[in-house]
Amino acid sequence: MVTWIGGYDPRITENVQYHKELDALATSLGMQTATSKTVPSALSIPSSIDVLFLPSVSSAFRDSLLAKSSLLLYTPVNEHFGIVPIEAMRAGIPVLASNTGGPLETIVEGKTGWLRDSGDVPAWTSVIEKVLYQLGADELQKMSVAAKERVEAEFSLRAMGERLEGEIGEMLSSERRQFNGGQQALLLLGMLGVGFAVLVGSVLAWVGFV
């Protein structure tokens, strides 16, 4: 079963329209769909359903779904960072995502997931088939461990806090660029020139020439 999960606000026209388009597309491909807005109804969905739409879910239910997943598909293009792949990898789930934006930084190709062109359907299909039918349990477990380790090492609160602290420390410890002797002399002459011009102007004004 393919489970589609996303933040959904019925007041936003684009959300409603996009859901309708996805449902219609799945139906046109001969797949049975269902939409569930509550946890009880989602749990009672029959196994004959091919695509399940969950417009909005709680964090606890999301984590429960991730724990039972084989692969997370992340389709946004040029996403600035994307927290969803991080959440999946933290749960030990490999991620297949668009090779643009944030996933380029968060996903390690072939180790914690895969990056493919969003418009290349065969490439995405190939990865899905690989995960579901070709990779052995040992290989999937290795990816799961690597995904968890990457999140802990690079994107955990501790890791990001240490990185931020290091950057701030480097900024505070950097010394101001020192002037060399020539620069100091030129600066002094410039200041003297300005001072002399001001003095002459004052004298001329005092004696009535200006």
Language-model regions: role of each:
Residues 6, 15-63:
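Nucleotide-activated donor-binding/catalytic signature segment of Leloir-type glycosyltransferases, i.e.
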Residues 24, 133-134, 153, 157-209:
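C-terminal alpha-helical cap of glycosyltransferases
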Residues 82-85, 103:
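Short glycine/serine-rich donor-binding loops of glycosyltransferases
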